[in-house]
Amino acid sequence: MRVWWRDLTDLVLPAECAGCGAPRTVLCPRCRAALCGRVPRRVRPVPEPAGLPVVHAAAPYAQEVRTLLLAHKERGALALTGELGNALAAAVRAGLGGGGADAGAGGFGTVLLVPVPSARWAVRARGHDPVRRMALAAAGELRRTGTPARVAAVLRQRRPVADQAGLDARGRLANLAGALEVTTGGGRLLGAGHVVLVDDLITTGASLAEAARAVRDVAEERSGVRTTVYGAVTREGRDEQRIGARTEREKWVHGAPEKASSNALGHALRAAVIAAPQDSFEMNRN
């Protein structure tokens, strides 16, 4: 009922920009440009958790974009879903286009957007599942622009987890380790297309790494291919001790995780988010 009422009021009541408060518009041109006006980039946390797939982000998590994501997630600004879905779709396209010889929508068949699941208590408190909602909008935008796509909401939490807010990178990894699983029958669905994990935001990468682990595990069980992801596949230099994310400046080798996803799924696992920390987009502008 709450979600239905919010949808109705979004259509009937006078709107203001959810990013800056400008009157008579759900999203003003300036805030739309902040959300969708950049070329999506590859980003990665520092330090990088083992097993994290290649991640592309559409926008920096700063100012207007932060406000928009929080308005949609926490305040039920559902009228933003379409624009947020467009931004997520752009990040998905960037990841598919960077896949090498099989890059491009035509080489992938159907794209399966797999949302990182929210905790059940969070969905109840918010009255909706924001990431799944944005994934559905992104799939619609991809189809509209010629890429076959659909949402495969096959991940669920297998145990309760603490609120990630306030936890550092190690704490988030420990909190989420082994927390996700693929639903019964979900493995069969994952074999029907090119899997792209989707979330609203990347900070430490713990959520996406755990989602990737769950997807790889079920894919390997179905294919009979088993590989081990070692913590040593992460890389952290002396000048990279803080937690953040940045665009890729050199080719890094992902051994076990990338080979596992490629062998078992038949393609390299990818991930896309709407936003990543600001420095991800400032450290590499070429």
Across the structure, where does each feature detected by a protein language model lie?
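Glycine-rich phosphate/pyrophosphate-handling loop used in enzymes and phosphotransfer proteins
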Residues: 1-286
